[in-house]
Design a protein with these regions (language model features):
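Alpha-helical transmembrane segments of multi-pass membrane transport proteins
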Residues: 1-213
């Protein structure tokens, strides 16, 4: 309730605060303890917002699953999130790299993973519970394409190196495909298709056969 009040009833802000709480609670905790802690402390905030004034036994299964998936997922991602980042520290011990830099790069490369839990809450059809095959196919395709756009925008490379404004466009288009509205999915798909064509053609021109003088 405190998190929901602090977020002013905003679903996105509530999810963001729950994400921070889950990352902190999950740092250094083994898997089972991680789930017990995050599901007990953080998940109720999401359920309070998604199913207000509803007894737990009457809350739809998919709503409960999405809330618990959200907190558990971020609890696990804490292993690659600085400053603790146990997995990154273990990897740096093997490679001989700097632990903090390894943690930062691991979080950067896995940026798409930080978006997936939001998609699960906003588009519960991804859990494949009480939905049609068509719904599953549609949300899965939009999720995958959206992740490609966001990932390329964050990394700064697709078929070739991206300009700063191209990165912003790709990230915005990818995020629009996460929002559970058909029109936003279509807009995002069209923008990403145009960006793909520009990248593909530009890369072909840059790497095409050179004229012999």
């Amino acid at each position: 309730n405190s998190l929901v009040k602090l977020a002013g009833g905003s679903i996105m802000l509530t999810l963001f605060l729950v994400m921070i709480a889950s990352l902190v609670l999950g740092m250094g905790a083994p898997t089972t303890a991680n789930y017990v802690i995050t599901s007990t402390i953080a998940a109720p905030a999401i359920l309070t917002l998604l199913a207000p004034n509803t007894p737990m036994e009457l809350v739809p299964l998919v709503t409960v699953m999405s809330a618990h998936f959200f907190v558990f997922y971020f609890g696990i991602i804490a292993d690659i999130t600085p400053p603790v980042a146990l997995a990154a520290f273990a990897a740096s011990g093997i490679s001989g790299g700097d632990p903090i830099k390894t943690g930062v790069h691991s979080a950067k490369l896995a940026i798409a993973a930080f978006i997936i839990p939001y998609m699960i809450v906003l588009q519960p059809a991804l859990l494949m519970v009480d939905v049609t095959i068509l719904q599953i196919v549609w949300v899965t395709i939009s999720a995958v394409i959206g992740m490609i756009g966001i990932g390329a925008g964050i990394i700064g490379y697709w078929y070739r190196k991206l300009m700063w404004f191209e990165r912003i466009i790709l990230i915005a288009a990818g995020l629009s495909m996460i929002y559970p509205e058909t029109i936003s999915d279509i807009i995002g798909l069209v923008v990403l298709a145009i960006m793909f064509a520009i990248q593909f053609i530009g890369n072909k021109k840059e790497n095409g056969p050179k004229a012999i003088a």
